[in-house]
Amino acid sequence: MIVGKAGKGGKKKPSVWAGVPRWAQVCTVFGAVLMFVSGVALVGVEALVARYEGAVGKADLFGDQAAGASERTSDIKGPLNILLVGVDPRKEEQLPLADSIMVLHVPEGLDQAYLFSMPRDLYVEIPAFDKAGFRGGADKLNAAMSYGSRVAGENPSTAQGFELLAKTVQSITGIQRFDAGAIINFGGFINIVDAMGGVTMDIEREVRSEHRHPDGTHRELRPGGGGYVGEQAVYPEGEQLLEGWQALDYVRQRYPKNGVPDGDYGRQRHQQQFVKAMASQALSADVVTNPIKLDSVLRAAGESLVFNGRGHSVIDFGLALKDLRPGNIQMIKLPGGGIMDGGQYRGERFEPAVQDFFQALQDEQLDAFLLEHPDFQNKI
């Protein structure tokens, strides 16, 4: 059942990513792609896998290729730390911003993982970066990509900006080295959802959209403020096949008046349900055994990614993580709060216990840490 199917005429349909929480976008794209690639490779569709690998963008995200550093050529072994950064499409002359910053930590066995977000507004010390002429200083974390991307006399380099962002995240978390990194362009990801034919989700209770009409167009703001007016898209209780814009709209909802009694906690739960539904759909026989659909999904996914695996391709990582499945990925929430200075918002900061989390990550003791700190787990 496709609920609230969008029409073709009338108002121009806004971007489906408008207002969607960035962590959900990143996790959906890269997590589903990795598991999808491993499943495809295992069933032996070599030609399509090669086509996908050719579509994935490649760049020197860590700044060591130009220096002649030897790339990693041994088999992929855990533990692994992968930095995932989501960006929106921008003009070539505009400085890039890291709209979402996430770390995927995979223990030695390569069959489970922990995924956590770094708040883009986290107020941090950004280290000096000679390549971009940046002397270092305190700012919000997402600004590191902009500072690092500056190239004298040329358009900004997103890959070079990623390098400074990676150094900044390492200084915060204590991670010595990232084993891989990816830049995910949200602009093209809707094609993946369309190519898959929608996503099946089990909706726990009826939810009404704050933002969309049943045809997918935006509801209008009430004159003078006070919310939106017009008919709402409705997501009925039970198993539903949702189009891309519908699934993304559903995971935005957080108001009790619209059927989400636990507010933002409920929204986070719905987001994680969506992530796992996407990953499961990517591995379904309907996708993997359908050459036409498979080709469309692979090409759309490839066009949304720029990847650097320090000598290993995204296919190599997909195969190395072949035992990693949606149920084995633990979603982590890092508690924090806002910093106010003279009544002005400066950014976010972590609670002290987050440093203990980072130490447990370095010591490979996250399971023990989470037993003692269950509030760090995003339950689904």
Listing of model-derived features with the role each one plays in the protein:
Residues 2-380:
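Non-catalytic, solvent-exposed segments at the cell envelope interface
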